[in-house]
């Protein structure tokens, strides 16, 4: 790809400025390709947030907006590289035997650029010629001199592919109309159909999927070929689902829940809460009727709060996994209610995979108790879990503004009492 020095100089000069302002004042003169420069400025700005390592390299070319939006973040790409390295080591390949990776759905090449570094040979396959041109330009700048770029259809390449160490795929999650699809059968290439051929070519196949998929069903669809399931989140937002396929038959795959530095792993058979995965929208939908008439004002005078010293809220990966039994067994926490997905304990837990709070006081919706609970409060962060009111309705009822250092959790306990817990957030890892 030929880009003039004037265009590169223009990009370097203006890349930290508002793209709209640059577009308004740019002079269409000389060798500067202004449309290309504007696209690159916007791409660099997105990369500086999502891919800081990439943004630190001068001369990279960024693709149009859609591939940039769909590509992995630096965190998730590095996670896959570490996973690939571990899987390679577990295969116990001869030290003298060269290792090889084939990425059949190369895209912008972010995952490939990190994963390929742990292999001796790496092949990037992409059917869009523009992305292949960008990859050929970018990979040498990123130090990937061992990378080979193939512009072809993934299934055509798979047909002629020899034996390799690992195959990686990120099936497209958009249909012909451009809308998102969330069933693996709707994704292309069709990994379910290609499963046997993929595993004939490589002993390990890693598949990246939408976090919106029902991972239990997806694992079942692969009929015992799934060795590991990785639910990867960052900033408490579930980003992707990774399946590791192997040549054996795996009744209980390893499930790994990762959220930034928090990692919890377990065997699928260890959790009896199967098929219970929860999203934020599902939690919100569990408000039973959204009316004050349904609120219980039963007094908490006889309330046994001996275990209610600390409150624990699982992170997004744990919620997606639905491994609530594992949490109770491993961390000695107690479910407030099976439908609330909040946990309490008598002791602080340093490594709980989620947020933790110190409970200051507890009240039912009894007016006298609420008044005592809210004493001195003008602001609070409010969350509802399995509660009849929305956050907005409860905030209005309690007459509190948003913000401050106090966190109120409104929920329902196992006896059906509607409770409000006044808490303070604890630092991660503190006791």
Model-derived features with residue positions:
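SAM-dependent transferase fold signal centered on methyltransferase-like domains
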Residues: 1-431
């Amino acid at each position: 790809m030929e880009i003039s020095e004037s265009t590169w100089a223009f990009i370097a000069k203006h890349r930290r400025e508002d793209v709209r302002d640059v577009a308004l004042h740019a002079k269409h003169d000389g060798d500067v390709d202004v449309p290309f420069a504007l696209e690159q400025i916007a791409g660099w700005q997105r990369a500086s947030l999502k891919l800081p390592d990439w943004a630190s390299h001068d001369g990279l070319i960024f693709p149009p907006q859609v591939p940039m939006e769909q590509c992995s973040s630096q965190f998730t790409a590095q996670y896959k590289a570490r996973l690939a390295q571990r899987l390679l080591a577990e295969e116990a390949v001869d030290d003298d035997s060269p290792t090889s990776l084939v990425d059949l759905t190369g895209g912008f090449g972010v995952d490939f650029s990190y994963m390929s570094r742990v292999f001796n040979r790496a092949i990037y396959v992409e059917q869009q010629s523009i992305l292949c041109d960008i990859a050929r330009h970018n990979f040498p700048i990123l130090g990937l001199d061992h990378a080979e770029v193939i512009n072809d259809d993934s299934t055509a390449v798979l047909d002629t592919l020899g034996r390799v160490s690992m195959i990686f795929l990120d099936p497209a999650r958009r249909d012909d109309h451009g809308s998102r699809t969330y069933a693996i059968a709707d994704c292309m290439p069709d990994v379910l159909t290609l499963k046997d051929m993929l595993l004939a070519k490589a002993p390990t196949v890693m598949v990246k999927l939408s976090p919106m998929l029902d991972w239990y069903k997806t694992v079942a669809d692969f009929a015992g070929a799934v060795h590991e399931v990785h639910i990867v989140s960052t900033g408490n937002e579930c980003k992707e689902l990774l399946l590791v396929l192997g040549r054996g038959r795996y009744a209980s795959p390893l499930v790994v829940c990762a959220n930034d530095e928090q990692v919890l792993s377990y065997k699928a058979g260890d959790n009896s809460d199967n098929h219970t995965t929860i999203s934020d929208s599902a939690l919100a939908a569990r408000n039973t009727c959204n009316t004050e008439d349904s609120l219980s004002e039963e007094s908490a005078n006889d309330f046994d709060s001996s275990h209610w010293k600390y409150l624990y809220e699982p992170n997004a990966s744990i919620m997606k996994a639905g491994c609530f039994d594992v949490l109770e067994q491993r961390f000695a926490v107690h479910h407030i209610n099976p439908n609330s997905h909040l946990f309490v304990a008598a002791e602080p837990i340093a490594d709980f995979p989620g947020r933790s709070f110190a409970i200051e006081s507890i009240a039912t919706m009894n007016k006298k108790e609420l008044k005592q609970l809210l004493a001195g409060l003008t602001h609070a962060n409010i969350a509802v879990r399995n509660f009849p009111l929305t956050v907005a309705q409860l905030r209005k009822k309690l007459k509190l503004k948003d913000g401050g250092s106090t966190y109120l959790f409104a929920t329902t306990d196992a006896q059906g009492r509607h409770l409000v817990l006044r808490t303070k957030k604890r630092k991660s890892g503190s006791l």
